[in-house]
Every structure is written in structure tokens, then in C-alpha cells.
């Protein structure tokens, strides 16, 4: 699969994607309004952000009882984003089994031009038909290998090859839990670069659960990554994503060209994105436990909800979720864990 058709300005060293309006949806419990989306897209576009991702936190079709219902239908937000952006491309995420082929077609008709397809890092084969459709439709394609910390670099590279052969033009090492530490990122990115060569680019998506989102992104670029994700003001699941404004500041310092103006993106983060956030994304005990125990970042809000419902500590729920090696889509098992801890508490009292 050639990378010639990828949207990539020759002056860039890496292409940045802002995920505030997708990963940030987890933090906001999927309650974005049209006014918020329009304002954020306009600010990011003006700052020179090449790609802006817009969908429910769990991708196309994610609005559901299991994941949480959207305040505004995601397809309406994709259309609004595409109409608002003057230069930025609009990307959308889909997870096979959550979203459908028809969702991809509708997202494209609403102005989305980059289809990002995510699977668990050992299940790339479930994305084959979706990449095929996306390429048939003329969409640019990106693949997400989620929870990349759970398998070694050489196995991750084999999964990346499956995506690339199916039509994926850039495969991401996705640190869904914010659990990877420096060399762990570099080794995985380097393995993918060696495997894919010129067949596909390699990207990195980080979280701040151990406070390493920016540092890990730098490691990824130095290992050969050409696409990097972040969110303004860390607006994302868990402790949030690598903050775009900080990434741009650091990239400017070390000579990595992105085409994004540091001062404009800092203004966007402070004046436009921050007011749309229900609260700052914190590196608190819950987030740290997720990074330390390797828990999917979107579990945070679900764990807090079950903690309040059953009267058990959220950080204990998250730690046990890590011990059980739960992955995205298994959020409902937090209820079982909460009941288990509740029984243990009652037994200890008797």
C-alpha cells in the first residue's frame, strides 16, 4: 500500500492529529454541543492543526447504553466540523463491531476524509474488510493497535502488517492505558517502521496516566513515527492525551516541524478548549493506577460511576481491572468487580 496519497505537507516532519473532539468525548461523557465543536474546530484550524478527529469517544456507533449516549449525534458533529474547517482535514474513528460499514459511508458523506479504524492489538484481522471499503471509497486510512503495551514489539509489528496489507496507510502504536515507558514506545515504533518500510507510515497515540505523554511522543518521532496524536489541554480519557500545545512547544525546541503555530495553539487550548471541559484532566490516583496497572483509559468514568453506585473505591476497581487484563468493550465487568469488592467489605465487617 503506497503512502503517496497521504495528506502530508513536505515542510512537516510529523503530522499532528488533535483528538480533543473524540478522545475528549470520554472525559465529557459524550456531551459535546454544536457550539463547542464549531468553536474548537475553528480555533484548531486557525492554529494550523492538520487533522482534527471528531466522533463519539468509542467511535462511530458508540452512542449506546454500554458506552454512554451522545448529547448531539456524532454524524451531525462531523458535518459541522467539516463545514467549519478551512484547511484541517476531519478524521473519524470506528471500531469494528461497534461501528459499521454504513457508518463509514455516512461519515464520508458528511465531510470526513480520514478513516481511523481501531482494534485490540492482537485482533487486526477484524479490520480487513473495513480498510478495504475505506480505500474503495477514496478515504485516507489509519489503523489503531490499541493497548499496544500488552504484546512485545515483534508481535505488534506482525499485526501492523495485517492492517497495512488490508489497505491501512498509517499504523499507530496506541498506548491506550498510558502504560508504556520511553523505550517501550521507541522499540514498538521502530519494529513497525522496520516491518512496514515504505508500505505505510507509523504513528503514536499516547496518554498521560504516568505523566509521559509528551516524552513518549518524542521517543516515537525519534524512532521513526510520522504521525502523532494529542489533545489540546490534555482533553482525553484518563489523565488525558499528550497536550498538543506542549508537544508543539517541545517540537519547536528540538527542530521538529509540524506547521502548527505554538502561540495560536496555546491560545486555543486556554481560551477555547478549556472552557468546553467539565474539569481539567488530572493525573490523580485513579489515573496513575490505570497507567501503572495497564487499564484502558476510558474505564475511568465508568469506574467512578460504579464506585458511587456501590460504595467502593474507584482506584481499587481500576487496579483489579488491570489484574484481569480487561480491554476496551469490557467496561460492564467493572460491575462484577464492584460487587466482588463490596462482598469482601461486608465479610470483613462481620
Curated annotation (Swiss-Prot):
Substrate binds at residues 22-23, 176, 205, 296. It comes from the Bacteria. Residues 14-266 form the Pyruvate carboxyltransferase domain. Keywords: Aromatic hydrocarbons catabolism, Lyase, Manganese, Metal-binding. One of its GO terms (molecular function) is 4-hydroxy-2-oxovalerate aldolase activity. The record marks 22 as: Transition state stabilizer. It is an enzyme of class 4 (lyase). The active site is at residue 26. PROSITE patterns: PYR_CT. GO terms for biological process: catabolic process; L-leucine biosynthetic process. Its EC number is 4.1.3.39. Mn(2+) binds at residues 23, 205, 207. SUPFAM superfamilies: Aldolase, post-HMGL domain-like. Signal peptide: none annotated. InterPro entries: 2-IPM_HCS-like, 4OH_2_O-val_aldolase, Aldolase_TIM, DmpG_comm, DRE_TIM_HOA, PYR_CT. Transmembrane segments: none annotated. NCBIfam families: 4OH_2_O_val_ald (TIGR03217), PRK08195.1 (NF006049). PANTHER family: 2-ISOPROPYLMALATE SYNTHASE 1, CHLOROPLASTIC-RELATED (PTHR10277:SF9), HOMOCITRATE SYNTHASE-RELATED (PTHR10277). Belongs to the 4-hydroxy-2-oxovalerate aldolase family. This is 4-hydroxy-2-oxovalerate aldolase 3. It comes from Mycolicibacterium vanbaalenii (strain DSM 7251 / JCM 13017 / BCRC 16820 / KCTC 9966 / NRRL B-24157 / PYR-1) (Mycobacterium vanbaalenii). The lineage of its organism: Bacteria, Bacillati, Actinomycetota, Actinomycetes, Mycobacteriales.
Amino acid at each position: 500500500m503506497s503512502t503517496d496519497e497521504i495528506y502530508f505537507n513536505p515542510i512537516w516532519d510529523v503530522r499532528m492529529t488533535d483528538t480533543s473532539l473524540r478522545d475528549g468525548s470520554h472525559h465529557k461523557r459524550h456531551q459535546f454541543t454544536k457550539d463547542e465543536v464549531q468553536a474548537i474546530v475553528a480555533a484548531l484550524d486557525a492554529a494550523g492543526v492538520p487533522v482534527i478527529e471528531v466522533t463519539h469517544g468509542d467511535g462511530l456507533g458508540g452512542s449506546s447504553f454500554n458506552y454512554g449516549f451522545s448529547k448531539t449525534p456524532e454524524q451531525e458533529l462531523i458535518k459541522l466540523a467539516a463545514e467549519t474547517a478551512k484547511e484541517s482535514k476531519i478524521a473519524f474513528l470506528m471500531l469494528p463491531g461497534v461501528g459499521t460499514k454504513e457508518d463509514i459511508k455516512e461519515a464520508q458523506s458528511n465531510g470526513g476524509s480520514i478513516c481511523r479504524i481501531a482494534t485490540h492489538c492482537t485482533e487486526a484481522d477484524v479490520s480487513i474488510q473495513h480498510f478495504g471499503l475505506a480505500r474503495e471509497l477514496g478515504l485516507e486510512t489509519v489503523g489503531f493497535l490499541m493497548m499496544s503495551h500488552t504484546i512485545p514489539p515483534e508481535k505488534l509489528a506482525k499485526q501492523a502488517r495485517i492492517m497495512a496489507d488490508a489497505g491501512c496507510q498509517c499504523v499507530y502504536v496506541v498506548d491506550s492505558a498510558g502504560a508504556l515507558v520511553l523505550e517501550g514506545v521507541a522499540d514498538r515504533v521502530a519494529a513497525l517502521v522496520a516491518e512496514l518500510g515504505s508500505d505505510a507510515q507509523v504513528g503514536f497515540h499516547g496518554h498521560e496516566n504516568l505523566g509521559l505523554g509528551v516524552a513518549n511522543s518524542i521517543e516515537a518521532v525519534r524512532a521513526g513515527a510520522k504521525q502523532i496524536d494529542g489533545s489540546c489541554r490534555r482533553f482525553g480519557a484518563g489523565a488525558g492525551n499528550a497536550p498538543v500545545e506542549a508537544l508543539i512547544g517541545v517540537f519547536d525546541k528540538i527542530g521538529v516541524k509540524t506547521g502548527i503555530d505554538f502561540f495560536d495553539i496555546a491560545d486555543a487550548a486556554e481560551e477555547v478548549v478549556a472552557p468546553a471541559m467539565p474539569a481539567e484532566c488530572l493525573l490523580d490516583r485513579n489515573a496513575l493506577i490505570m497507567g501503572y496497572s495497564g487499564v484502558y483509559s476510558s474505564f475511568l468514568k465508568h469506574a467512578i460511576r460504579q464506585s458511587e453506585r456501590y460504595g467502593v473505591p474507584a482506584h481499587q476497581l481500576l487496579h483489579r481491572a488491570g489484574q484481569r487484563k480487561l480491554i476496551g468493550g469490557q467496561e460492564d465487568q467493572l460491575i462484577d468487580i464492584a460487587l466482588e469488592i463490596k462482598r469482601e467489605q461486608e465479610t470483613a465487617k462481620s
